[in-house]
């Protein structure tokens, strides 16, 4: 009887100790770690309880600007920039997440340390936008856009903003400057 009770206690301990914790650095289409597309601004302090949440209050309601919320880890390293749908509204959801830290990775291991070639191998590219100082590569599968500095492009493409840039024109070794998720 004692052996059965001991086995039962051990099984219960093993079952309760095997929690399946979500990866706080996993990037998917509708969430980043515990942050989801339905997370409200008021919930950020609970989600990032071990980190630092920095909110800037614009103070000028006439500007209509969105207040960026910055997330830093306990060591002071910047992790994320969050933009809510409505500025100064604690019930607003997050619309855009700018991923700064290289620990954040997609299921295909794409991070800020990745290259354009890595993105091409992992995802189907939906669109490429040619901006003044950068190129933005959009991937609809994960609602992400990857920004590449034009310094990574051949010199013939660096100063042309009106022309469409094709996938084949971007070098595979071009580094990602940062990437964003749009919800």
Regions found by a protein language model. Give the residues of each.
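Short acidic-hydrophobic surface loop/beta-edge motif
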Residues: 6, 69-72, 137
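An amphipathic alpha-helical core segment
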Residues: 133-149
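Bacterial Sec-dependent N-terminal signal peptides
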Residues: 1-25
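Short helix/turn-capping signatures at newly exposed starts of structured segments
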Residues: 18-132, 142, 160-183
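Long, compositionally biased
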Residues: 144-161
């Amino acid at each position: 009887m004692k052996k059965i009770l001991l086995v039962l206690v051990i099984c219960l301990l093993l079952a309760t100790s095997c929690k399946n914790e979500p990866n706080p650095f996993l990037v998917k289409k509708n969430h980043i770690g515990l942050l989801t597309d339905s997370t409200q601004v008021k919930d950020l302090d609970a989600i990032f309880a071990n980190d630092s949440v920095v909110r800037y209050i614009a103070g000028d309601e006439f500007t209509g600007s969105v207040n960026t919320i910055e997330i830093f880890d306990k060591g002071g390293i910047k992790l994320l920039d969050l933009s809510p749908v409505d500025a100064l509204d604690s019930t607003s959801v997050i619309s855009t997440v700018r991923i700064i830290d290289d620990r954040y990775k997609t299921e295909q291991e794409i991070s800020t340390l990745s290259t354009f070639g890595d993105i091409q191998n992992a995802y189907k590219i939906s669109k490429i936008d040619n901006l003044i100082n950068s190129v933005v590569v959009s991937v609809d599968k994960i609602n992400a856009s990857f920004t590449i500095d034009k310094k990574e492009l051949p010199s013939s493409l660096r100063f042309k903003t009106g022309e469409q840039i094709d996938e084949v024109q971007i070098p595979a070794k071009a580094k990602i400057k940062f990437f964003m998720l749009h919800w």
